[in-house]
From Swiss-Prot:
Domain of life (superkingdom): Bacteria
Protein name per the record: Glycine--tRNA ligase beta subunit
Catalyzed reactions: tRNA(Gly) + glycine + ATP = glycyl-tRNA(Gly) + AMP + diphosphate
InterPro entries cross-referenced by the UniProt entry: DALR_anticod-bd, Gly-tRNA-synth_bsu, Gly-tRNA-synth_heterodimer
Enzyme class, first EC level, given as a word: ligase
Subunit record text: Tetramer of two alpha and two beta subunits.
Amino acid sequence: MSAQDFLVELGTEELPPKALATLGDAFLAGIEKGLQAAGLNYTGKQVYAAPRRLAVLIRQLDVQQPDRSINIDGPPLQAAFKDGEPTQAALGFAKKCGVELSEIDQSGAKLRFSQHIPGKATASLLPTIVEDSLNDLPIPKRMRWAASREEFVRPTQWLVMLLGDQVVDCTILSQQAGRESRGHRFHHPQNVVITTPANYVEDLRKAYVLADFAERRELIAKRTTELAMQQEGTAIVPPALLDEVTALVEWPVPLVCSFEERFLEVPQEALITTMQDNQKYFCLLDSEGKLLPRFITVANVESRDPKQIVSGNEKVVRPRLTDAEFFFKQDKKQPLETFNERLKNVVFQAQLGTVYDKAERVSRLAAYIAPLIGGDAQRAGRAGLLSKCDLATEMVGEFPEMQGVAGYYYALNDGEPQDVALALNEQYMPRGAGAELPQTLTGAAVAIADKLDTLVGIFGIGMLPTGSKDPYALRRAALGVLRILIEKQLDLDLTPAVEFAVKQFGAKVKAAGLAEQVLEFIFDRLRARYEDEGIDVATYLSVRALKPGSALDFDQRVQAVQAFRKLPEAEALAAVNKRVSNLLSKAEGAIAEQVEPKYFDNANEFSLYSAIQQADQAVQPMAAARQYSESLARLAALRDPVDAFFEAVMVNAEDAKVRANRYALLSRLRGLFLGVADISLLG
């Protein structure tokens, strides 16, 4: 079957830059879906996305649908005819197939409808495939334009559709398909004739358009790096910003610009924020990570006088930097702590009080937590009290991303200790999955306190997260607490900490069962964390059954169980623990704590008892030191005496005292393993 390249390009007004790559990928996916549904094969694919166009190239696409044969079996002949006359079953089958009964094959044991369906020309199928793909694009809100009733993310301007060197005749979104595209608005305002699908990229390149998103992205990244090196700096190139800039230009030309050095007195985070978010510039840092008074802009034109573009960008950014400078100076005119007065009029949550109320709670809880993790209570309390002050500053009012960062600078300006100042920023850490954690113990205490306060408060008024709705980011808060404690190796029992947080709210929350509910929610987050690490759910559940209060202790047990499961004895011991657990659950009355050797009547009982005593003596110091892996490895040696016991001993002996003593022995055995985890859940 012959094949040809297929190209479709939809020209539009400027597409939303943050959605461009997604729209391009979805356009390709939709076309592939349509081609596959039509049974059309191809050898390659490529998507192109630029500010004014979405395009897809399909390489070596079948020009003809393959013929198809369908065979549908109907009712048996015996049921299809009675006394030589067709039954309702036969007539119904013919009607279902859309033919007369005489056209149905009656030569076999059943009625059979056979039909040969010739394949259609690909060119006749492509308009519907393209149109369906465009209709399925993830566009939150479509728009209409002029007098047209068509809807799309932006008004359409032109349409190119070529199969081989022939135009696919159709009209989509009010555009008649042709072979004429458009070049760069300024460098090549004339139409561009696309000779063949394979020449699409080069035809546009001659018209100063780089259609390939990935090519533009790579060019911008490479040239930005080169220019930064020439300035003896390193460019800050966040992937999201790089994607957005790539989506804004068809012919990228990076240029170096500068600003006055006096602006460097402003916190560099504020300058970087305004240059990145508002102007889409790439900022430059020196070898020590300090901001240079230069930045890189990406022009969409190759100017004969690039100095004019540089000058224009420098003029545009100056007022924004001046604003940041003004806010910084204004805020520093008063001590940071005084901003707490404003927070007394800012509601955190209607039922839970003001932001100032929250700061006071965080202060007390942080002071409680700090000494438990090796920190200083007084400094943690001070940091907690100042933690929300910068929310009332001019700087954060203009640049919300500066919350915490602004507080750090203002605290230093007021002469606060370094760790107190750092804690004002670290309270928000981690800001996302895999993000940086607090480096100071003061910061860790405030971060944990802030998150626990939010969890307890919101749970306490019944506003639990449901499905995808989590307006107070409670899942992220819980994961943040766990990450800080586990990855910073901080051994904090969360149970009393959460109970302390509950007491602070008083009558504002429903306290009954609240601490348990919050703790359950926090530790439930570990399940997904361990699954992401490749740790089996059963391992998590074996530790969860013991309900450790320390996240660090929980993690150490999980890692130990994971290592234990790799031992050759693990599977058998897990099965034995499950058997023992079932036996003990059926025991009548309380199980004795002491084992009485005088009731043993089998050598294997003595052997197991001796092995348990030796193991107990060995693992006690290990358990005290939380050497859980070593403890389980030592307990693995119990496999042989345990196996021998169950082979030779009837646990449910007729003699009640012997039976009770054997239950006590097995309880001792199970207790050894429960010192680490309930491994009966591993089976």
